Structures are given as C-alpha cells and as structure tokens.
C-alpha cells in the first residue's frame, strides 16, 4: 500500500497497476508455460487488463473485459471540474486526501442504497469486509482520481 489509511484507495500512477499486473502474469507464465493465459477483468481491472493485453498481446489466449472503466464516475461533478480539482490537489501535495464527499470505511451502507443486484452476495461481502481490514478499501483519493483520469486519456488516445 502506498498510504497508511486502509480505507483510502490511492495510487501514484496508473502505470503501477499495469506493471504489477504484468509482473504477476509473467510469474504465472513462467510457472505454467504449457497453459494458456486467459484474462477476465471487470471495471478498473478491465481498463488495466485492456492496457496490459495491448502492451503484451502475445501473452493472452483470450481476453474478456466486463464494463471496463474507460472513465471513472464523478457523481454530479462534471468531468473537467473533477479532474481539475484532482490535479490542483495533487500539485499542492493533497493527493492522499479523500475526494470531496467521500469518507473512510465505517461499515454503514445497505443493500437498498447499493448498486448490488443480489442481496445474499451483498450481505456475504459486507460481512467479509467487516471482518477483514484488508478488504475495507472504500473511498478514492485525489491521487487515485488523477491517476484514473490519466489512464482514461491514455485509453482513449491509444485505441
């Protein structure tokens, strides 16, 4: 982790995600050279997986990207304003602050206000998260938002 706050989703550069993922893939390919490497990735993992597959196209036998995060959601804040604020916060050393309106994990939340479609799955994961601090990542930092914006621009400019 790049921050001491276990609730904060923070990264210094989106390229770290790609490098870490490709390092894991390299290890798997070395350990199991006769097996095909298939990639299934969702949301931000879909963006990371898509870039990784573009950087190392010969590594993956099949690639499935489920709702890849081409651009992060910024709630009711327009994209140009959200990225401008994130850049300013990063320039002034506030990259590890929570994005406005976000807070640390506190265990609150309900199925009814979530985007989940399966109540048993929601409850199971909520209980796991409550029991395991390492699963309590919760809210993005301005650094994460800025890195995600840079990744978004990279994806759209390097089709």
PLM feature spans:
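Conserved alpha/beta-hydrolase
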Residues: 1-4
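Short, well-ordered alpha-helices that flank and scaffold nucleotide-derived cofactor binding pockets
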Residues: 30, 54-58, 150
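Hydrophobic helix-cap positions at the C-terminus of alpha-helices
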Residues: 28, 52, 155-158
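Alpha/beta-hydrolase active-site loop
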Residues: 9-29
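Short acidic-aromatic active-site loops that bind/stabilize oxyanions
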Residues: 11-14, 134-142
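Alpha/beta-hydrolase-fold enzymes
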Residues: 44, 48-137
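Conserved serine/cysteine hydrolase catalytic core
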Residues: 137-159
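Alpha/beta-hydrolase fold nucleophile elbow
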Residues: 32-43
């Amino acid at each position: 982790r790049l921050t001491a706050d276990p609730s904060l989703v923070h990264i210094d550069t989106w390229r770290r995600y790609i490098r870490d993922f490709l390092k894991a893939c390299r290890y798997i390919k070395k350990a199991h050279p006769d097996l095909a490497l298939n990639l299934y990735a969702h949301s931000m993992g879909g963006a990371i997986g898509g870039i990784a597959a573009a950087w190392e196209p010969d590594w993956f036998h099949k690639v499935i990207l489920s709702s890849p995060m081409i651009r992060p959601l910024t709630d009711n804040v327009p994209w140009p304003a959200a990225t401008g604020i994130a850049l300013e916060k990063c320039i002034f050393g506030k990259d590890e602050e929570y994005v406005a309106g976000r807070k640390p994990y506190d265990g609150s939340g309900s199925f009814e206000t979530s985007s989940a479609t399966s109540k048993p799955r929601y409850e199971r994961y909520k209980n796991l998260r409550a029991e395991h601090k390492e699963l309590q990542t919760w809210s993005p930092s301005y650094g994460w938002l800025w890195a995600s914006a840079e990744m978004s621009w990279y994806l759209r400019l390097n089709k």
